[in-house]
Amino acid sequence: MGKRILILGAGFGGLAAANALRKNLSAEHRIVVLDRKNWFMMGLVKLWILEGSRKLEDSQTPLAGLSAKGIEVLNDEVIKIDTTASAIETRDNGKIEFDYLIVALGAELVPDRVPGFVGNGHNLYDPLQVPGIREKLLSMNGGKVAIAIMGMPYKCPPAPYEASIIISNILARAGAGNSQIDVYSPAPMAIPAAGPKLSATVVDTISQHGVRFNPLHKLKSVTESQLEFDNGVVKDYDLLIGIPPHRSPEVVRASGLTAGSDWVPIDKHTTRTSIHNVFAVGDVTEIKVGAIALPKAGIFAEEQGKVAAQQILNEIGIGPTAASFSGQGYCFMEVGNRQAGYLSADFYNKDGPSFNLDPPSEENYEKKLNFERTRIRDWLF
């Protein structure tokens, strides 16, 4: 008898899992992907929209391509996850039972957690707001631009620093190169998960573009012209660009899968939750590696999605020994002018997490373009 495998979320993890499952399972097994959106767009695209090299409407790929592969797509919202009954409740399609569940719902942004941000600040991680940020920058004649990381952890750790360089370039080209750009972070270093050495390299890179890094500055409240931080510091600003606090979606927290925390704890190798037939992958999860947590990045979600799929295939009796998540990943750090650095990491290294940052090059930038291109091709066509 065929199994129904339900995947909540059509991001990196969900799409990777759905494709791996469909590739290896016969048609008697149903694979269902549910997402509120009917399209997929990588988060990295927001930087290209900010830069002006890409438009939002040209960056959204319809999920309809999954149907041609034999993957069912539900454009719906999950409102309850009942792990005891192995079922979910949805807004439009009612109750849906499952044999296996993969939770890949990502992280929820909570901009109103910082009083005054909504209405005064602009959300860098909301693709609908990014074109407006670009327009604001193009209209500036100078002034103070504040980029505030409002909570930890957050998706794609290098992104605020990449954005600061892009913003510096935009202002310089617009004749407002005398503007002051500050990045504020609650953390003691730029990218805590990557350690002090690599963080220092990141700070040095942005400083070459006139951007100042302000560690240990957790945003407390915002007014029309001022930022107040937990450490008592008050700063003036003209344009505030924020990376809001993140947490798992309410429906996940209400399910009990987070065990009272903000994130779903999972087995670091298998992606299994505390429920035998429920897996969780990507930004919705938390994996502790010593004193740090695995960063929230698309490459980790993708690899975890493949592992969850192979774990399920193994239980069904298909394939070799179930796969194990390696803790290895990489990302690109853009520095403008079609140049990008290449950051690789091994969080499960037996001697402790290890990192390497290759210097910026046009070749790495082309690799980033290809990163998007190949995944969209493989997942949605």
List the predicted regions and their residue ranges:
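FAD-binding core/adjacent interface of flavoenzyme oxidoreductases
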Residues: 1-4, 71-162, 169-173, 241
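Beta1-alpha1 glycine-rich phosphate/pyrophosphate-binding loop at the start
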Residues: 2-71, 153-193
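Internal hydrophobic alpha-helix adjacent to the cofactor/substrate pocket in enzyme cavities
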Residues: 169, 300-326
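Short, electropositive alpha-helical surface patch
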Residues: 155-171, 297-304, 332-343
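C-terminal auxiliary extensions adjacent to catalytic cores
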Residues: 341-381
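A Rossmann-like FAD-binding core segment of flavoenzymes
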Residues: 30, 69-81, 96, 171-263, ...
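FAD-site-proximal beta/loop scaffold in flavoenzymes
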Residues: 117-141, 234-239, 243-303, 310
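FAD-binding beta-loop-beta segment adjacent to the flavin cofactor pocket
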Residues: 263-280, 335-348, 352-353
